Design a protein with these regions (language model features):
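A short, charged helix-loop
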Residues: 1-15
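Hydrophobic helix-and-loop "lid/oligomerization" segment in the mid-to-C-terminal part
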Residues: 13, 18-187
């Protein structure tokens, strides 16, 4: 007999929801929705999970995100790319806790004509990169080619053991390569 508790149902739905961008990415398939239907039948409280994921913030998180969007967000003038470098000092200044940057990389995709967003975060041990895109733009290929990363078509990550400024420079230098690859592949 299967044992399914509310905690298990909630954890499964949370993973599905966050991995699919709230079911907005093309990685959401019919089977995903069938699984969610099963979770609903097992007692999933979808509204409770959504509130916990998307509508609960602490003040320091909001200030960190506000600082990044106001002072760090750069939109490339030649290519539809937004870049957000975030220093370790900024994380410390705003009392960063795991999860405080969750979803931030997606926000620049709402800017008109931006189809790729790259968040570059300086951690104590290395620099972490998060890539997001709209449509058929394979950011996983860019992450794999230059940033020791990978992922999916519209969501990828990478990491580098270099100073933040060097990683930002490398991202900017490889933007033309990435868009040339897109052009050559017919996307």
């Amino acid at each position: 007999k299967e044992i399914v508790t509310p905690d298990i149902v909630g954890a499964l739905y949370t993973g599905i929801n966050t991995d699919t961008g709230g079911l907005s990415h093309n990685s959401s398939h019919p089977q995903t929705y069938r699984i969610i239907a099963d979770l609903l039948e097992a007692g999933l409280d979808k509204a409770y999970i959504h509130e916990r994921i998307y509508q609960m913030n602490n003040l320091s998180r909001l200030r960190l995100i506000g600082n990044v969007l106001l002072n760090k967000l750069e939109v490339n003038e030649q290519y539809p790319v937004a870049i957000m470098p975030i220093t370790r000092e900024e994380l410390d200044r705003y009392n960063y806790k795991d999860g405080d940057l969750e979803g931030l990389v997606n926000i620049p995709l709402s800017v008109h004509n931006v189809c790729v967003s790259v968040q570059i975060t300086e951690r104590r041990e290395r620099v972490k990169l998060s890539f997001r895109s709209k449509g058929n733009v394979p950011v996983n290929e860019w992450a794999k080619a230059f940033f020791n990363g990978g992922g999916h078509l519209n969501a990828a990550g990478g990491q580098m053991d270099l100073p933040l400024a060097e990683v930002v420079r490398k991202v900017k230098e490889t933007i033309p390569w990435f868009f040339e690859q897109l052009k050559n592949s017919g996307i």
